């Protein structure tokens, strides 16, 4: 559960309605793989990830980024039940994929950077603060199975 004021909830949902999940998702996942290259080990089947340009133009990275943000959209629709919303993904990432849960926090922070880049002045410090709460809540929900 994320504790947002009514104003924060309105701000994050209004902005999220404008997000192009394909564009933002691909950029966010791509940036994660470039900025934190050790995360690439989970994407061996994605082909060429040898340079930042290769990562950012990789069709599989873009497609998976879209998939990630579609799941994030589910969370945005259920901010009062993130643990339940992400229970199956938490189990998958813990039991089958063995993803370090710290990576969820890293991706959340990268997503905030990408949103700031895409929305510029509309992404005010207040909106950023609200999104930081949301991505922290999603990261906690995804890490739930690890505890």
From Swiss-Prot:
Protein's UniProt keywords contain Transit peptide: no
Modified residues (Phosphoserine): 45
PROSITE patterns per UniProt: GLOBIN (PS01033)
An example Gene Ontology CC term for this record: blood microparticle
BP GO terms, sorted: hydrogen peroxide catabolic process
This protein's record includes keyword Methyltransferase: no
Keywords linked to the UniProt accession: Acetylation, Heme, Iron, Metal-binding, Oxygen transport, Phosphoprotein, S-nitrosylation, Transport
Positions carrying S-nitrosocysteine: 94
Binding site for heme b: 64, 93
GO molecular function, one term: peroxidase activity
Function: Involved in oxygen transport from the lung to the various peripheral tissues.
Record's subunit section: Heterotetramer of two alpha chains and two beta chains.
Protein name from the UniProt record: Hemoglobin subunit beta
Organism of this sequence: Carlito syrichta (Philippine tarsier)
Source taxonomy: Eukaryota, Metazoa, Chordata, Craniata, Vertebrata
Gene of this entry: HBB
């Amino acid at each position: 559960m994320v504790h947002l004021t009514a104003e924060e909830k309105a701000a994050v949902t209004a902005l999220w309605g404008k997000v192009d999940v394909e564009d933002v998702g691909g950029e966010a996942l791509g940036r994660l793989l470039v900025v934190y290259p050790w995360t690439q080990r989970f994407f061996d089947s994605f082909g060429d990830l040898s340079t930042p340009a290769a990562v950012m133009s990789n069709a599989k990275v873009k497609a998976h980024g879209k998939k990630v943000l579609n799941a994030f959209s589910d969370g945005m629709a259920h901010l009062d039940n993130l643990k339940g919303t992400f229970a199956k993904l938490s189990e998958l990432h813990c039991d089958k994929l063995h993803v370090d849960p710290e990576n969820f926090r890293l991706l959340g922070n990268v997503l905030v950077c990408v949103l700031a880049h895409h929305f510029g002045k509309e992404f005010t410090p207040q909106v950023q603060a609200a999104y930081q709460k949301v991505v922290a809540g999603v990261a906690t929900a995804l890490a739930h199975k690890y505890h």
